[in-house]
Amino acid sequence: ANAMYLPVPGVAMVAGHERYGGGITTPGGKPTMSVMCFGFDTFADASYACWDIHTRWAEKMDRRFGGAPNIRDFIVVPEGVFKSDEEIWEAMTETIIEAGYEGRAGFQMDVATDTYHNKEDGKYYGLFNNQPKTKDQLYEFYLHIIREFPFVILEDPFNEDDYDTTAALTKDSGIQIVGDDLFTTNIRRVAYGVTKGAANTVLLKVNQIGTISEALEMIQYAYKFGYAVMPSDSRGEGEAIADYAVGINAGSVRECGIGPRANRFMEIEAELGKTAKFLGARGLKGFKNQQRADALERKE
């Protein structure tokens, strides 16, 4: 396939924190929340929207609690500022609307649930609010927030070995469900996920897999079974992520909406000229995201 597609980028918004009594292990900044900008004609336009939303968000958070610390552009929300993460999502939705991008930008969340999962009783503690949750309660909670807020991507919504509940959510949520801890860029785990219908997207961390040829084998396998592949820059690949994301025709990419990585994507878009295609909402998995794409096309 010719490399000509530019993926949907995101921009960092909020880093997790021990807001509600914390997880079972140290959350390490999870869940993280980003905004994905998909309703645009070019990567450059999407990147501008990422910058615009992030700037407004930083100002809003500054007004809310002054001098917010941040981890790699993710703003760390201190304890006691919000009663639950639903208040954060309301503020994020407000920011998107104020910037004029309603229906063209949505949420990506890396839940990294393993941090909050107690293997003894199977419950999740300190995730989103201070209520412990069984996997079924967490599943219902996700369906509720997907109805209430513009979520387009959830990553690792359940613990890394819960393929069955992940599969149910993949089917019922209608959005992009990404496996990171679920798959660890490992072809055997991806193959097992495929048999279960768990997730519809594999997070790609090149450093996790050993060799580039192993990574390519995993990518081809995922594509063969209709899964998407979402490159992640979480391990400091730098600007090279843009070259290989376009090289594999990825539909979406973790963050990369602002800064040097975004600049490299825009250079590639300019080099490709008229052949460059920004995938937009079509680059996102899930029937709800395809409905978003339909709605945007009707508006054109």
Role assignments for model-derived ranges:
Residues 67-69, 82-299:
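Catalytic core of soluble alpha/beta enzymes
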Residues 1, 299-300:
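Accessible peptide chain termini
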Residues 1-77:
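Mobile "lid/hinge" segments at catalytic clefts and subdomain interfaces of large enzymes
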